[in-house]
Regions:
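A cross-kingdom marker of C-terminal helix-rich interaction/assembly modules
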Residues: 2-267
């Protein structure tokens, strides 16, 4: 009997595809976790940052959601690149910014829609106050300031007058405490990385450790979340939070979820 044309070839082709797939999975499992997660962070950052959100209606709330999300994925990209280059221990400033952005997006998403615009304006008012302080300090030091105070004053804000909201805007700890979700893990990582992101005594001791109370050695600060496991989970929370805010603000579902879909297509 003449065999059915192509059947053996098809089985062979399927077998080969299965073997190649298993080989890729074995190779993936053989790689260190920090490299696997760094590669994922790079792919997902590229995917999210490439999403065209120009059709999202312009509003302060939408700007905060999209802007913070993009900033977080830019930091994620830098952290991943330096981690792959064996410089992960030096990324504390980037990690600190990343954790803070994650907290802020989760906090912002947890605010009632009716209060979200006032919260955004409270953030803007706090930023304006900080810029004014910077302007004053520069003038007192005899340094020319290019901060246009008059232009900032012309910007009308409807900031929340609630003391609790103002404190949450100024103090990240208060924002964490006010968020319904338990942000304890992200907050702990932010606090830890804050130690290594500033000119602290601990940072000096890590880079120039004492050896036997006689000589000064060479060292590095600890690499928090070395394998980027918490980082990977945080990127999920970030992109989902941004999408939820946009959807809650009435952005069409396809557009509101575009970044989330781009992110999960990299899984």
């Amino acid at each position: 009997m003449t065999p059915v044309s192509g059947a053996p070839r098809r089985r062979y082709s399927d077998d080969m595809r299965g073997r190649r797939s298993k080989k890729r999975r074995r190779a993936q499992h053989a790689r260190p976790a920090y490299l696997v997660n760094a590669d994922f962070a790079l792919r997902s950052a590229d995917a999210v940052l490439a999403v065209d959100l120009s059709e999202v209606p312009l509003s302060r709330v939408n700007q905060f959601a999209v802007g913070w999300m993009r900033a977080a994925f830019e930091q994620s990209r830098v952290i991943a690149m330096l981690t792959k280059g064996e410089m992960g221990h030096a990324t504390a400033p980037n990690r600190r910014a990343f954790w803070e952005l994650a907290v802020r997006l989760l906090w912002f998403a947890g605010i009632a829609r009716s209060e979200r615009e006032k919260a955004a304006d409270a953030m803007l008012a706090h930023g304006r106050s900080t810029e004014k302080t910077t302007h004053t300090h520069m003038q007192s030091m005899g340094i020319t300031s290019d901060i246009d105070i008059a232009a900032m004053e012309e910007f009308v804000l409807d900031a929340s007058n609630e003391k609790a909201m103002r404190e949450q805007v100024k103090n990240l700890t208060e924002a964490v405490m006010a968020t319904e979700q338990n942000l304890g893990v992200i907050y702990r990582l932010w606090r830890e990385d804050s130690t290594w992101a500033h000119a602290t005594a601990f940072l000096a001791g890590r880079y120039a450790p004492a050896e036997g109370d006689v000589t000064m050695g060479v060292g590095k600060p600890p690499h928090i979340d070395r394998d980027l496991e918490a980082h990977r989970l945080a990127t999920m929370a970030i992109v989902i939070s941004a999408g939820c805010i946009l959807a809650d603000e009435g952005v069409p579902s396809g557009l509101a979820s575009a970044a989330t879909l781009a992110f999960y297509n990299e899984h």
